[in-house]
């Protein structure tokens, strides 16, 4: 069994890590840390996990094969020395995802820049071989995952794209703040970040394409939809062929048939799963390509992708513990 520790288990991503790993047939959870909730059973914070015999601890003195860092941005770089060399590490923060110059442009000063190059960017569909040999993996951001996977087949066709993102309330994490309380958050379609979103850095690093995000908060709890626009003179058939690079990927589904309830990707149809649904439309008259990407920000955009990376790092079937279909209806 793989002995697993989760550092920072009280947030939504931490809760999903506990849920997924508790059901994983090759995993034993040896520790879940939280300074605020140390000593309390995990279901006191994550009510859906009632019946799971785990308590939070503030003690980092554990014996683990892999450690998931599910702490806020800026915290992993402060904690990393506690764990380096003792276990494989999968970091779910932004601290080690992008090169030093990009980090400083989008986030500010990095406290451990010498470690950035030691981390593999944990997007399996692009970096599977590197992840397999890695000791340190930086889990991608949720928005970045959606956009990179949608854009990657077309990265040689354009140097610049516009990206419209519709994101859920859970994407903002669990910290209470006034805009996130129910009377303020309910029924909104709110411009959250009109430009210079931090996840643009990951897209630029991984595709070489400058992506200009405009992010809207919408009235859903989980899930996101990315709509990507660029111009290209061609035809829809050839564009669809490019997406076939994903035909053997276990967690990418191409939404190309236009019958039934789903004509294009919709986060409603991926909730609770590690799937990404990709689709495309081509406005031939205006030479405009529109690519769609939908995922669950807490699963493929977070905990699920981290478990997928763990599976690869330990030589397991990467779908292990993740091979279930989305919830429906929701």
UniProtKB/Swiss-Prot annotation:
Main localization category: cytoplasm
Molecular-function annotations in GO: N-acetyl-gamma-aminoadipyl-phosphate reductase activity; N-acetyl-gamma-glutamyl-phosphate reductase activity; NAD binding; NADP+ binding
Keywords noted in UniProt: Amino-acid biosynthesis, Arginine biosynthesis, Cytoplasm, Lysine biosynthesis, NADP, Oxidoreductase
Subcellular location: Cytoplasm
Pfam families: Semialdhyde_dh, Semialdhyde_dhC_1
SUPFAM superfamilies, sorted: Glyceraldehyde-3-phosphate dehydrogenase-like, C-terminal domain (SSF55347), NAD(P)-binding Rossmann-fold domains (SSF51735)
GO CC entries: cytoplasm
Pathway in which the depicted protein is active: Amino-acid biosynthesis; L-lysine biosynthesis via AAA pathway; L-lysine from L-alpha-aminoadipate (Thermus route): step 3/5; Amino-acid biosynthesis; L-arginine biosynthesis
Coiled coil, from the record: none
Enzyme Commission identifier(s): 1.2.1.103, 1.2.1.106
SMART domains on file: Semialdhyde_dh
GO biological process, one term: L-arginine biosynthetic process
Catalyzed reactions: [amino-group carrier protein]-C-terminal-N-(1-carboxy-5-oxopentan-1-yl)-L-glutamine + phosphate + NADP(+) = [amino-group carrier protein]-C-terminal-N-(1-carboxy-5-phosphooxy-5-oxopentan-1-yl)-L-glutamine + NADPH + H(+); [amino-group carrier protein]-C-terminal-gamma-(L-glutamyl-5-semialdehyde)-L-glutamate + phosphate + NADP(+) = [amino-group carrier protein]-C-terminal-gamma-(5-phospho-L-glutamyl)-L-glutamate + NADPH + H(+)
Residues binding NADP(+), per UniProt: 10-13, 297
Residues at the catalytic site: 142
Entry similarity comment: Belongs to the NAGSA dehydrogenase family. Type 1 subfamily. LysY sub-subfamily.
Role of this protein: Involved in both the arginine and lysine biosynthetic pathways.
Protein name: Putative [LysW]-L-2-aminoadipate/[LysW]-L-glutamate phosphate reductase
Source organism: Pyrococcus horikoshii (strain ATCC 700860 / DSM 12428 / JCM 9974 / NBRC 100139 / OT-3)
Gene that this polypeptide is encoded by: lysY
């Amino acid at each position: 069994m793989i002995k697993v520790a989760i550092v920072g288990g009280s947030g939504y991503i931490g809760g999903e890590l506990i849920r997924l790993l508790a059901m994983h047939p090759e995993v034993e959870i040896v520790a879940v840390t939280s300074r605020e909730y140390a000593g309390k059973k995990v279901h006191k914070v994550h009510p859906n996990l009632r019946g799971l015999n785990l308590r939070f601890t503030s003690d980092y003195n554990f014996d683990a094969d892999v450690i998931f860092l599910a702490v806020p941005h800026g915290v992993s770089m402060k904690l990393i020395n506690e764990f380096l060399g003792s276990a494989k590490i999968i970091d779910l923060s932004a601290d080690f995802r992008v090169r030093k110059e990009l980090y400083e442009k989008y986030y500010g000063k990095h406290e451990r820049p010498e470690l950035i190059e030691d981390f593999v960017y944990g997007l399996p569909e692009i970096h599977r071989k590197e992840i397999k040999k890695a000791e340190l993996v930086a889990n991608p951001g949720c928005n970045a995952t959606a956009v990179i996977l949608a854009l990657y087949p077309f990265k040689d066709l354009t140097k610049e794209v516009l990206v419209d993102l519709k994101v859920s309330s859970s994407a903002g994490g669990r910290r209470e703040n006034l805009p996130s309380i129910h009377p303020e958050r309910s029924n909104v379609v709110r411009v959250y970040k009109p430009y210079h979103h931090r996840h643009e850095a990951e897209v630029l690093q991984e595709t070489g394409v400058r992506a200009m995000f405009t992010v809207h908060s919408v009235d859903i709890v989980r899930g996101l939809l990315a709509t990507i626009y660029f111009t290209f003179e061609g035809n829809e058939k050839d564009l669809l062929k490019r997406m076939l690079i994903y035909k053997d990927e276990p967690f990418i589904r191409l939404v190309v048939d236009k019958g039934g309830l789903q004509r294009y990707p919709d986060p409603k149809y991926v909730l609770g799963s590690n799937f990404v649904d990709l689709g495309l439309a081509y406005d031939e008259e205006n030479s405009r390509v529109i690519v769609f990407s939908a995922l669950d920000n807490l699963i493929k955009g977070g905990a699920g992708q981290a478990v997928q990376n763990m599976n690869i790092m330990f030589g397991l079937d990467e779908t292990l513990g993740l091979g279930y279909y989305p919830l429906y209806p929701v």
